[in-house]
Amino acid sequence: MKAFRSLRILISISRTTTKTTPRNPHQAQNFLRRFYSAQPNLDEPTSINEDGSSSDSVFDSSQYPIDDSNVDSVKKPKEATWDKGYRERVNKAFFGNLTEKGKVKVAEEESSEDDEDSVDRSRILAKALLEAALESPDEELGEGEVREEDQKSLNVGIIGPPNAGKSSLTNFMVGTKVAAASRKTNTTTHEVLGVLTKGDTQVCFFDTPGLMLKKSGYGYKDIKARVQNAWTSVDLFDVLIVMFDVHRHLMSPDSRVVRLIKYMGEEENPKQKRVLCMNKVDLVEKKKDLLKVAEEFQDLPAYERYFMISGLKGSGVKDLSQYLMDQAVKKPWEEDAFTMSEEVLKNISLEVVRERLLDHVHQEIPYGLEHRLVDWKELRDGSLRIEQHLITPKLSQRKILVGKGGCKIGRIGIEANEELRRIMNRKVHLILQVKLK
């Protein structure tokens, strides 16, 4: 009986469940759709980074299509570790200086020798190769190399008022970008080393921040920290180039610039030669006016020579370069003539980004930023990963620097990345992140 009762209960339950179906057959589906649509989509990236900054404030070059046609392949075949010079030295000592016919004759003789002679000859050749490897290197130098006792060197400092064209001249003479060049003042914030090597002579350029003098003869307090190193290093250079914008001087003379030129030209330094460079002569329409400016400063005894140049277009720079080459003294080179040091490349990466920043962001924002190189890593495929942070003290400045939807920092990053790839001739993965202090 109990079995029959339980069977009846099960039948009644099954009948009630079939009658309680929802009126709307899509009701359950709508419920599930509303439920899942309220959940976060975990496959899509979040708009907030781990440090709390918006994703719009980060530029990543890997997310932008960049033309690689002008960049050589970074993957190079592995070179043999054996020095071919040893083989050449052995051939000279073992076979002598053979002509083509002599080489053929030796080859024929070797082929006709018996096995024992071949074994002996191989042993002698192996011994000669080992001796050549153990010998001290001979005095023969590769192409472009100069003996240390024949090397000449010169350290050149370039100073002047802000926006005088010091960075442009440094970049033109060195042949690549080592300092930020912009129309804004106080573009250079630290000394940047550029190296020019020609023949047996190496010239090292030090580009310094713009210097100005008050009536008292001392630097202004608002840029005191920026120019402190420039003033302390003035007397350390072999040659000092004092530069000013001659076009601006003719249009609206600045008494502070005149004081700086006279201050540097009044007292002679027996251990240092000083030259006065009138830059941006290409902007002066009446060339006779240049002679008037030269006469204005001709009585300053510390200046050995006067040069009229255009650091941007290169006019007159050849004469200045030749003068500097002639002033070089016998001294070993301080920098590698064939490769840039990693420190120089790091400075170049900072200066390239800084120049683009000055071109796209106006007012006082670029000068209040803290610009840091956070990561510098060479990847396995030969490319270079560079990460820089731009730290601003104000939220309003951060919004201006980022732009709507990250458009401004994106434009800065794209232009800087393309120029870095061109300068370094390799693939560069540039990451720029704008942060709030």
From Swiss-Prot:
It holds the Pfam family KH_2. GO terms for molecular function: GTP binding; mitochondrial ribosome binding; RNA binding. GO terms for cellular component: mitochondrion. Residues 152-333 form the Era-type G domain. GTP binds at residues 160-167, 207-211, 279-282. Keywords: GTP-binding, Nucleotide-binding, Phosphoprotein, RNA-binding. Residues 361-437 form the KH type-2 domain. Residues 39-65 are annotated as: Disordered. The modification Phosphoserine is found at S111, S112. Residues 160-167 are annotated as: G1. Residues 279-282 are annotated as: G4. Residues 309-311 are annotated as: G5. Transmembrane segments: none annotated. It comes from the Eukaryota. Residues 39-50 have a biased composition (Polar residues). PROSITE patterns: G_ERA, KH_TYPE_2. SUPFAM superfamilies: P-loop containing nucleoside triphosphate hydrolases (SSF52540), Prokaryotic type KH domain (KH-domain type II) (SSF54814). PANTHER family: GTPASE ERA (PTHR42698), GTPASE ERA, MITOCHONDRIAL (PTHR42698:SF1). Belongs to the TRAFAC class TrmE-Era-EngA-EngB-Septin-like GTPase superfamily. Era GTPase family. Has a crucial role in plant growth and development, possibly by influencing mitochondrial division. HAMAP family: GTPase_Era. This is GTP-binding protein ERG. It comes from Arabidopsis thaliana (Mouse-ear cress).
